[in-house]
Amino acid sequence: MDRRNFGKLLAGTVTAAGIPLASVAEERTRSVAEGEPALHGRNSAVTKTAPRGNNPWELVILDAVPPHISETGGMAAADVDGDGKTEVVIIGVGAIVWYRPSTAEKGIVSLGRYGVGVALEDIDGDGRKEIITGRTIPDSSGGPEKWILCWYKSGANLNDPWTEYILDSETAGHAHDMIFGDLDGDGKRELVANARYCDRPGLFAYKIPADPKRPWKKQMVQTGLTAEGTSVGDLDGDGREEIVSGPYWFSAPKAGAFSGQPWKTHSLAPGFRELCRTAIIDVNGDGHQDVVIVEDEYPDGRLAWFENRIKAVPEHPWIEHPLDAPLNFSHSLRAWRDDKTKQMHIMAGEMNAGGWNAPYNWEARLIDYSTEDGGKSWQSNLIYEGEGTHEAVRADLDGSGTHVIFGHAAQVVNKTENIGWLQMFRPQGKPSVFAHYSHKFVDRQKPYTGIDIHAVDIDGDGLQDIVCGAWWYKNPTWERHPIPGIGQIIAAYDLDEDGRKELIGIKAKPGAEDYESALTSDLVWLKPIDITKDLWEEHAIGSGDGDWPHGNTLGPLLPGGRLALVCGYHDHSHSPPQIFETPDDLTQLWAKRVIADIPYGEEMIAYDLDGDGKLDIVAGPYFLENLGDGRFEPHLLIDPKYAQFENQNAISRIAIMDVNGDGRPDILFTVEDVDWNDNVRKAFFAPVGWLENTGSPRDRMFNLHFIDRVRSPHSIGIGDIDGDGETEVVVGEHDPFHPYRSKCRLYIYKKADPKGITWSRFPIDNRFEHHDGAKVVELSPGKISIISHGWMEQSYVHVWQQG
């Protein structure tokens, strides 16, 4: 079923199979009349609003790589330190980490293996929230690790050491869900936690003792039932809160919630599977607490609310009102009533993928459903599409009454670890200036793949044309013209200082069967003579010792301002980068030599990184210091202990920008991560980040910062795209195996704080693969454009412009 048509289906008269909705409801009603406790009500009419590009929400990446966490698990948000602003706590395999979004600060609470369930609650009555969660400990007999429940108290400052207290040292399994509620009606809240992924799953309640540092009183609610999605609320109106867990609800014995007597199990949603998210709220305003439920680990999950009739019609205590389907791994669910508008809202968020090797969900959605008439009709507002989230929570960021949504990515396509990133979705009042970009095919029949793309005024008319592969495209008609005798153009520079740029290219290998085998390092430079007749003047530079140049830079690098070309080769492990020195007579061969014995062959930039007046070379993680006598001394800029950079060639594309405003040039980078093994053939999520200039590149390594993690990013560009005086970053994804099916994205990033710790991400396109593209250029006066191309989508040359 096409989920985008589901809103129409709910309001229509037939299902996708041609069965009248009334018949479906009648059939369901008949089945429950034979013993099931839930009746099937009318499908609520859902009106869908806010199509792609019109929604004024933006995504902020608060942390692309949470420290010490190899697999993100759960999260919670509240004012932990009493400053009136919201903190976020995220847990996972490796650590508990706290964040202060208002200042972009973060810190470590504890190291260890944590799961999904986490809650924030004032345990000791001091007015500040503590962290409650579960972690593993070694089994003393050498068996599998055991789970315990514990809570953490901060010092006077969140950066001070936190103290751990164990509340249950003998749990049955992983506490996937945690929530607090008043189960015994004494005005104090108790903990509810389930046990999952164990031999004997169950659900348990814990009462906080007078001294919460001691073990807590434990009550079994149920054992043997597998269920996820725990919430609490007074369902039967007795003044005590009951527990909902998946498709069941549980009521305490009359003797009391912690009397030791068994709790009673009731059926709530018999047609729903066990793995759910739930929320309790009075949907229709009749004074009774209803239940919202969504199936969370399925690609065909259903969302519904169940009308509470426990007291009115005890023989049929629940009426099911379907809301939406299919929802794809919707592992986030929240419900609330707006204090101002009195509208009731449900927020559902889909994951990137479910567990157990589920198919990837490239179009994951975050959706807000609202009703003004007690659940009779609903509006569906698409908050965000194309970004999966897990265990998302809603919170007032700074006490202003404006709520944001915090979440984290889960089940992303990583090579070895499930490192998710921390998200904040925030309303903006109006759509972003980046929301409406138009795409144009410059070429959709280019004969073969280009290895780079450039904007160069070829014909001298004052407009930047586009050069890609062995062709140039005239602006603005984009007619394709050949550059004769050339395999690829790799650079453009005004070599003879006549005010127009010449092109540097490589010759094609004669008789090659395809473009890749035709690549060489036979370098030439070209000058247009009569472009109306495709006449060019060609001069040899020389042949490099590598296979073909995958990165290069050109500038006055040598004593006296002499020009030189530096090339890094695709087979960098065998051929270090070389420098080609311009002769006095440019028509002669250029002298070549190895510039530095480093294993790098990707993008290079000539830039005075150390501020001494001489152009250095930035080569990925290396700084090649210009010594002023024609020699260049290599310095590694980052600590190789970072796993992402064990292969230093993993840094693929770079740009120079003063990110944090300290006046020093920093290095933006992307990391290519592709596995060409026939048994794998995947493009993995890899970092986009920046290296902070510490002031002395030759003496001190740069500080590493992550912006985001996207699919094998192999394209980067920078420019003031929105005209506000600040520089934005453009990044394109690169999936050479499944470019169409995997929906490669083109993103714009804008700093969300002045220091560049957090970044807002704006999707521009989700259709094309990018390789050495995403260049920010000015194709017409005062109008910024983005040009790009792909590796496998060889026929395409693209341009994006606003409007």
Regions found by a protein language model. Give the residues of each.
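N-terminal export signals
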Residues: 5-25
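Beta-propeller-forming repeat regions
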Residues: 4, 30-803
